Regions:
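Membrane-embedded alpha-helical segments that form the functional core of polytopic membrane enzymes
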Residues: 89-102
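Membrane-interfacial alpha-helical segments at the cytosolic side of multi-pass membrane proteins
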Residues: 70-85, 129-144
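"…centered on the first transmembrane helix and the immediately adjacent amphipathic helix/loop
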Residues: 1-72, 76
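Membrane-spanning helices that line or support transport/gating and their immediate boundary helices
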Residues: 33, 108-111, 143-147
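Interfacial helix-loop-helix junctions of multi-pass membrane proteins
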Residues: 103-127
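Membrane-interface helix-boundary motifs at transmembrane edges
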Residues: 2-5, 82-90
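Alpha-helical transmembrane segments of multi-pass membrane proteins
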Residues: 16-23, 99-106, 134
């Protein structure tokens, strides 16, 4: 049996998941204040260019984008960790386990936090972000492998 030398990459995945769960444990007021601060800064930038947006609508989209971005980062990290040291023989199982389990646990945590609620739509956004991050990582891995393959082939022919 082949020893798993690079298991430490999963520590980064675990720390990132902890960060996601920590954000979900914020009470509604703190979470809303944090995203409102981001929304105000973005609206100030957008207003400079002559576009005016309703704050409450924009704030809603900032919150949804935060869900997407959090899980895009997770998808990227999980895909990278899968390429380095898969947890299971099936890379598909590795990916799907995180794709389904982490958003479900995240939304379940929010059910028990003061002022927060669990929403299926957020799970879909989380899953979409995870898939996007995984796809970006996969494409980057393919590009890097292709560049290395070309470099090796050029060295052999020279």
């Amino acid at each position: 049996m082949k020893p798993r030398r690079h298991w430490w990459v999963w520590i980064f995945v675990g720390l990132y998941i902890w960060m996601i769960f920590r954000n979900s444990l914020m009470i509604a007021e703190a979470s809303s204040a944090l995203s409102a601060k981001v929304a105000y800064r973005l609206i100030a930038i957008i207003n400079r260019y002559g576009f005016y947006i309703d704050f409450y609508t924009f704030h809603h989209y900032v919150r949804k984008l935060a869900h997407f971005a959090e899980f895009a980062g997770l998808g990227f990290l999980v895909t990278m960790a899968m390429h380095i040291c898969p947890l299971f023989k099936s890379r598909f199982l590795n990916f799907v386990l995180f794709l389904i389990a982490i958003p479900a646990i995240d939304e379940t945590i929010q059910q028990y936090v003061d002022g927060r609620s669990s929403q299926y739509f957020d799970m879909l956004i989380d899953g979409g972000g995870f898939l996007f991050g995984g796809l970006v990582c996969y494409v980057l891995v393919l590009i890097i492998k292709d560049l290395l393959f070309r470099k090796n082939r050029q060295e052999k022919t020279a």
